[in-house]
Amino acid sequence: MICVIAGICIPMARNMIRSYRLTAAASAVSGAIQGTRYQAIMVGCPYTVTFTQTSTTYQIATEPVSGSPPACATSFSNLGSAIPWGTAGDVTMSPSTTLQFSPSGMVTPTTGSLSFTLSNGLSTKTVNVSGVGNVQVASP
């Protein structure tokens, strides 16, 4: 009896955990996009966020303010180290994507596109970013 219940419950629990991890990854990616856009607007310099599918991390970079009078630099510098958006092997992204945010809040993809997918092998979530930075996560 216990074996029958375990045979049913364990696969269901694994699928539920995979679903939670996919939702968490979508939330992390969405939050990183929105937060990076707000930083670009607040600081007044361009920012980028790069999502790497192989390492399941994202890296934020900016053209830092320097000089007198203060001005944005002409090249991007990473802010801190890469941050995981998911657990390696659990959730995949396609394609790797880099989004650039202008101080006006506009978004342009420099690698990939404004739409990419996250998948856990069972289900998929599509992240769509509008040109003005609105983020929508959809499940097909």
Predicted regions and their residues:
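N-terminal single-pass transmembrane signal-anchor helix
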Residues: 1-13
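Type IV pilin-like appendage domain
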Residues: 46-103, 125-128, 136-140
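Short, surface-exposed interaction loops/tails
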Residues: 109-140
